[in-house]
UniProtKB/Swiss-Prot annotation:
Classification of source organism: Bacteria, Pseudomonadati, Thermodesulfobacteriota, Desulfovibrionia, Desulfovibrionales
Entry binding sites for ATP: 20, 220-226
Main location per the UniProt record: cytoplasm
Domain called PUA: residue spans: 285-363
Pfam family, one: AA_kinase
Listed name of the protein: Glutamate 5-kinase
EC number: 2.7.2.11
Subcellular location(s) of the protein: Cytoplasm
Source organism of this protein record: Nitratidesulfovibrio vulgaris (strain ATCC 29579 / DSM 644 / CCUG 34227 / NCIMB 8303 / VKM B-1760 / Hildenborough) (Desulfovibrio vulgaris)
GO cellular component, one term: cytosol
Catalytic reaction equation(s): L-glutamate + ATP = L-glutamyl 5-phosphate + ADP
Residues that bind substrate: 59, 146, 158
Length: 380
């Protein structure tokens, strides 16, 4: 199927759409742009009325808090930023509640940390809550809980949060509203003549360092993080549409068939939702470097990682931790759950199965990472 036909069909047939909007679209130097919020509420309400489930991931709390506190407080450092988020989140949600009510819809605030999604029980509880809200016709407005999140439990940015949320709500279309017109073929900051890519077949083939500029002044992620999120979505079989969020009626125009923005195609080889959860539940705790034979067995034969193929171990981690698996050249080829902690793995690396038994005793696993607990070509 041609990508234009694929795009038209996906927009038409999507059942659950996750829409992410960034601070650069939502806010100005003086605070929240109420006209943008009203337009967004109108378009999302129309999408829901067309029979689609809608989940909104919205940045803007910190920026809204900065605006409210501008005349009385100087915001410097993480504690101040988290406090500004607490001030801004309530104001941001108030604006959304009022805007959706004007179009006859209820909205609900959902604040998450990465720990909420990496713990399997809490992940399933979050899924049940979202399903109840969507069954009721309520539009969830999701943001990272910046006020309580510590650095190691942060998503990093809301692009990452949205890509993980696709797995929670079983989304089948991801729309990212940005301050750019789409994805440029080159860095527009250094090449003003760079044009918009209408379609990206595979994010892995792009030179992201060349194409993408730095982070925006009000948000936490630039186009680089948006493409990483799109690549993660593609692994789930979910296409991404990156749109210019500041343009009038942009969602309405896109869903009506206007060829705006950049379409990122899903991968043909889709991973299971369980493997996706395993891979992206948290940041990897360490790296296991393997030899060429082991890398070939993983990538070409779908095998598990055995102790004999391990040639180096870095980082401190316990059994059951998520680790990167790197090839001989250092390129990450997979992530997975290690059956061994770093100390035992250092002892058994390069050894055959019978040698492992002699080193560790009978209580050992034949695999370092079982293929069922591994995701190849993960974007980490």
């Amino acid at each position: 199927m041609e990508w234009t036909e694929e795009r038209a069909a996906a927009l038409r047939e999507a059942r659950c759409v996750v829409v992410k909007v960034g601070s650069a679209v939502l806010t100005t130097e003086t605070g929240v742009n109420l006209a943008v919020i009203d337009s967004l509420a109108a378009q999302l309400s129309a999408l829901q009325e067309s029979g689609k489930r809608v989940v909104l991931v919205s940045s803007g709390a910190v920026a809204a808090g900065r605006s409210a506190l501008r005349d009385c407080c100087e915001i410097a450092g993480m504690p101040h930023k988290q406090a500004a988020s607490a001030v801004g989140q309530s104001r941001l949600m108030h604006h959304y509640d009022e805007a959706f009510a004007r179009y006859g819809h209820l909205s609900a605030q959902v604040l998450l940390t990465r720990d909420d999604l990496r713990n399997r029980e809490r992940f399933l509880n979050a899924r049940n809550t979202f399903q109840a809200l969507l069954d009721w016709g309520v539009i969830p407005v999701v943001n990272e809980n910046d006020t309580v999140a510590v650095q190691e439990l942060k998503f990093g940015d809301n692009d990452c949060l949205a890509s993980l949320l696709l797995n929670v709500v079983e989304g089948d279309l991801y729309v990212n509203l940005t301050s750019a017109s789409g994805v440029y073929a080159d860095n527009p900051q250094t090449n003003p003549e760079a044009g918009i890519l209408p379609c990206i077949e595979d994010v892995h083939t792009l030179d992201l360092d060349v194409m993408c500029g730095g982070k925006t002044s009000v948000g936490t992620g630039g186009m680089y993080s948006k493409l990483l999120a799109a690549s993660r979505a593609a692994q789930l079989g979910v296409p991404t549409l990156i749109l210019p969020g500041r343009e009038p009626r942009i969602l309405e125009r896109a869903f009506s068939g206007e060829p705006v923005g950049t379409w990122v195609r899903p991968e043909a080889r889709v991973v299971s939702r369980r493997k996706y959860w395993l891979a992206y539940q948290s940041e990897p705790s360490g790296t296991v470097t393997v030899d060429e034979g082991a890398a070939r067995a993983l990538l070409q034969q779908g095998g598990s990682l055995l102790p004999g193929g391990v040639c180096d171990v870095s980082g401190a981690f316990e059994p059951g931790a998520l680790v990167r698996i790197a090839g001989p050249d250092g390129t990450v080829i997979a992530v997975g759950l290690s059956n061994y902690g770093d100390r035992d793995l250092v002892r058994i690396k390069g050894h055959r199965r019978h040698e492992v038994a002699a080193i560790l005793g009978d209580a050992h696993f034949p695999e370092v990472v079982h293929r069922d607990n591994m995701l190849l070509d993960a974007v980490v």
